[in-house]
């Protein structure tokens, strides 16, 4: 991917230009970990989740998806990230996983995790659609070294 390099644990390092683009598109993106946290220890995993989502979001922006699609995917990713943090609290085995493995375990080809508290079937279907796109992206993109 142009403008990105592979960092530690397979994380992508986002260029300053891409960081600025994300800040314009989703000004509260860097606040997501704070909004997801149950306790202070959740900030680092939350930041890692946001870092894992950034290349996908940049891919959407580069493909010039509609504003409606982008906003829907942002909203869905926000819910998925919060659910990933919640699952880390609910399952000690999940809390031990590195974030990339947690994402790989909970974001599958057929959708994402069931969101709790329970949401409508329509909302869950939208989240599953976003998760399928994220899964395809994560499993078909090749990091530039």
Regions found by a protein language model. Give the residues of each.
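Charge-rich, intrinsically disordered N-terminal extensions
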Residues: 1-145
């Amino acid at each position: 991917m142009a403008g990105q390099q592979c960092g530690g644990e397979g994380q992508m390092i986002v260029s300053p230009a891409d960081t600025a683009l994300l800040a314009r598109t989703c000004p509260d993106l860097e606040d997501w970990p704070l909004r997801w946290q149950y306790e202070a220890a959740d900030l680092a995993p939350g930041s890692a989740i946001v870092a894992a989502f950034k290349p996908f979001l940049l891919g959407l922006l580069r493909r010039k998806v509609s504003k409606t699609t982008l906003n829907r995917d942002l909203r869905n990713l926000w819910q998925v990230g919060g659910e990933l943090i919640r699952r880390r609290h609910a399952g000690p085995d999940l809390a031990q996983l590195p974030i990339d493995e947690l994402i790989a375990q909970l974001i599958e080809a057929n959708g994402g995790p069931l969101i709790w508290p329970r949401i409508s079937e329509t909302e869950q279907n939208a989240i599953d659609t976003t998760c399928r796109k994220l899964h395809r992206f994560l499993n078909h993109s090749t990091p530039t070294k």
